Amino acid sequence: MLSLKAFLALSLSIHLSQGLVASVSHRRANACTELSRSYPDSTIHPGSSVFAEDVIEPWSQTCQTTPTCVFAPASAEEVAGGLAILRKADQTFAVRTQGHMPIPGAADISNGVLMVTTSLNSVQYADDSKSVVQIGAGNRWLDVYKVLAKDNLAVVGGRFGQVGVSGLLLGGGISYFNSDHGWGANSVVNYEVVLANGTVCAANAQQNSDLYWALKGGSFNFGIVTRFDLATFSVPYMWGGSAFYDASALDPLVNAYASYAVASGGSSDPAAHSDPSILYNVTTGEVSGYGIYMHRGDDPAPAALKNFTDIPSTFQDFRVGKTILGLENDTTPVNFGVGNRRQLFSSTALASSAEAVYLVNQTFFDVIAANPQIKTTTDLSVTNTYQLFTPGMIRAAKASGGDPIGLYDPLGNGVLAVLYGGNWADAKDDEIIYKFFQDMIDELDNRAKKLGLYYDFVYLNDAAPTQTKDIFQKFSNGTALPKLREIAESYDPDQVFQTLTPGGFKLINSPA
């Protein structure tokens, strides 16, 4: 039996623990109240129509959550003020720009505060030269392209207009202009960042240059970026569009990409871009193809893409448009709007070669055949998309000053990133589908390793929930993680962006 002294000590310990928990709960409950008091026009509570618009309609239903309240700051200063309130309350929170990330918790939260940056939506030139455009973090790329099109200008931005600026750039950034300029992040000349201590600072080649480097792919680990300043360049015309194919065209489509994805192929033209996909409808068993093709300039028949445009298609729409804006509607996949679907990305990479292209295609169909249980799911569609990081892109990224991602070119053909995508209707199928996609990645990685084609990289913006811990240890062939951690410790010594923002891609979760 406990002595009276031990009993009293235990009782006091329990009482103090309960008091501490109650104190923390009280502080957290007060976070939304304090946000409302300090920023009444920027704080949204459950029950309002605006709350429903911002929260109840995520892009992917896998991210359906209910935050305690929504905070929509209208300036960097409001971001800093709101962050101070959240820190004082020890309140967990998430930051969402456009929410185009299907990983639960990456840009959503339950029982915490959701900070949305959609009010940070200015797009303006830095000066009269129009060589730099200043983009608020809450914009979609379509908003940016509408401004730039008036001056026949472009930036290394997203391929699809509905995608958010912030998420794309903080994860690297695939663009139609990568071959000449590197990642989208490599064209950022300055970041406006709110640090954990509330300081609003600039990060560029001259100021906070270590933070500037880290933000080029380091995700949401160092602060809240409120503005991106990007270099512009002239693009008066773009040729491009999309094409749909039936099953009879799949072999020609894969053959065309096998020829394209080598240094002697069409990808050697830095103006060209090709992203073909193979689609499999699990419910119907139908197999089809889809391709997005772009070429900078007004050539109505670019030779670099002839192997694709020669393939008979069920539908195609190729034309010359004014700037990238003139083709945006023709190249945005239909599932990029908000809907009632559940979405999943999963990614891996290979050293690009014709053999790698064929391996990806064969593995895709082999794993589908080996997993008949997916036929029990409701309305599942699966895609296999090829995305090439060309030798020119890798050189341009290094020439810009480099980045944490640190791509290298193993065979001289660039790096072939593979995106497996899925969308389906019912949450009851999540476990089967998540395992199926992991099996797909594991099988492709194993086969690639046996052939000497494996490239140890996962593109952050296309990662699966099971891959969030693996991202940073793969950067720069395994050498970037210690430096990223050192920079995070310097700018966020209290680990606010490691612990109070629990979701997404965290340095603290990456294996040493």
UniProtKB/Swiss-Prot annotation:
Q: What happens when the gene is disrupted?
A: Reduces the production of PR-toxin and leads to a large increase in mycophenolic acid production.
Q: What is its EC number?
A: 1.-.-.-
Pfam families of this UniProt entry?
Answer: FAD_binding_4
Q: Which residues are glycosylated?
A: N197, N281, N307, N329, N361, N477
Residues annotated as transmembrane: none
**Which GO terms of the molecular function aspect are on file?**
FAD binding; oxidoreductase activity
Position of the signal peptide: 1-19
Q: Which domain of life is it from?
A: Eukaryota
Keyword check for Electron transport: no
FAD-binding PCMH-type domain ranges (all copies): 63-235
InterPro entries (UniProt xref): FAD-bd_PCMH (IPR016166), FAD-bd_PCMH-like_sf (IPR036318), FAD-bd_PCMH_sub2 (IPR016169), FAD-linked_Oxidoreductase (IPR050416), Oxid_FAD_bind_N (IPR006094)
Provide the alphabetized UniProt keywords: FAD, Flavoprotein, Glycoprotein, Oxidoreductase, Signal
Protein's pathway = Sesquiterpene biosynthesis
- Pros-8alpha-FAD histidine occurs at H100
Task: Give the family from UniProt.
Answer: Belongs to the oxygen-dependent FAD-linked oxidoreductase family.
Query: Briefly, what is this protein's role?
Result: FAD-dependent monooxygenase; part of the gene cluster that mediates the biosynthesis of PR-toxin, a bicyclic sesquiterpene belonging to the eremophilane class and acting as a mycotoxin. The first step of the pathway is catalyzed by the aristolochene synthase which performs the cyclization of trans,trans-farnesyl diphosphate (FPP) to the bicyclic sesquiterpene aristolochene. Following the formation of aristolochene, the non-oxygenated aristolochene is converted to the trioxygenated intermediate eremofortin B, via 7-epi-neopetasone.
UniProt name for this protein: FAD-dependent monooxygenase prx3
Q: Which organism is it from?
A: Penicillium roqueforti (strain FM164)
Q: Coding gene?
A: prx3
